A protein has these predicted regions:
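Non-globular, low-confidence helical/coil segments that flank catalytic cores
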Residues: 1-305
């Protein structure tokens, strides 16, 4: 009887192990499929993601209403491009904290309009920052006075940027494409720092509020994986010449819901559609995130449109 019992137990145990292994394989395959098909992202909204989750280059297009604030991270390095309006600064700091940022290597202010620089003083007061980067401007006195107001008592150095300057962000590189050194530009939008971020062959173009005239002056660039559309989707930017040259796979637009300017303008959306770009907007989808993982760009949004 004992032998018979053992003979029945062994096959039963084998079947249990076999069935369990098969179930585990199916589960692993299902998880692998979800993660690599892009469906996984729908179950992991980016609102709770942190910069440290991915050592590669990541861009967060923050939801600051009718303004712009872009966080770039690579490894443990962080750069903030603009801050949005002063009234959005505390919310921006909360978002940066949620994304794991406790200090900044750089704060880039693309140009001195309140929807881009309004929160600069608050950010510099709250976060240790190595370098404040502002665009070269012919009125140096005004430039230094404005920068001094932002800096206050912050222990942060000031750097004046112009085309050709490069800034290391971990293994990523940020290159200034505009404005030129010693320029006499008097249109504040066209004074915008235009930045090219590069990492493992992936390129992101950040245009500030620069107009089509400036866009055309920095061409040719070749293919760009992600474009942060200029001037919140205004018809004055994101021109056909730029789009024909860079053929972006994705375009982010930072704008406020039901804003008084009507951003993004229909003409810009039509141009982007014609160029084949997938468009995501902060007014519709909240925080937008672009991560470079194994040489490929993965884009997610805080909420569905």
């Amino acid at each position: 009887m004992k032998r018979a019992s053992r003979q029945k137990t062994a096959p039963s145990l084998f079947r249990a192990l076999r069935d369990g292994a098969a179930g585990l394989c199916i589960l692993c395959f299902a998880l692998f499929f979800l993660k690599n098909s892009g469906i996984w992202a729908k179950f992991r909204p980016n609102a709770g993601e942190t910069a440290s989750e991915n050592g590669g280059l990541t861009l967060f297009c923050e939801d600051v209403g009718q303004g712009q604030a872009l966080l770039l991270t690579c490894g443990d390095r962080a750069a903030l491009v603009d801050t949005g309006l002063a009234g959005k600064a505390e919310g921006l700091l909360d978002a940066l904290s949620d994304q794991g940022v406790t200090r900044l290597d750089y704060l880039f202010i693309t140009h001195p309009h309140s929807d881009h620089c309004g929160g600069a003083k608050t950010v510099l007061s709250a976060l240790p920052t190595d370098l404040l980067v502002v665009p070269d401007y012919y009125d140096k006195d005004a430039l230094y006075i404005q920068a001094g107001e932002w800096l206050g008592a912050a222990d942060t150095a000031l750097d004046i940027a112009y085309a050709g300057r490069e800034y290391a962000l971990g293994s990523a590189k940020l290159t200034v494409l505009s404005p030129p050194q010693g320029n006499d530009i008097d249109d504040m939008n066209d004074l915008s720092l235009v930045l090219l971020a590069e990492y493992t062959g992936v390129k992101m173009l950040l245009c500030g509020d620069a107009s089509q005239t400036i866009e055309e002056s920095i061409l040719p660039l070749g293919h760009i994986d992600l474009l942060v559309a200029g001037h919140h989707g205004s018809r004055t930017a994101t021109g056909e010449a730029l789009l024909d040259d860079i053929t972006p796979a994705y375009a982010f637009i930072s704008c406020g819901r039901d804003n008084e300017y009507g951003h993004p303008h229909r003409e810009v959306l039509d141009r982007l559609e014609k160029a084949g770009a997938q468009v995501l907007r902060t007014d519709e989808s909240g925080v937008l995130t672009a991560r470079v993982i194994q040489g490929k760009l993965r884009v997610t949004a805080e909420r569905d449109q």
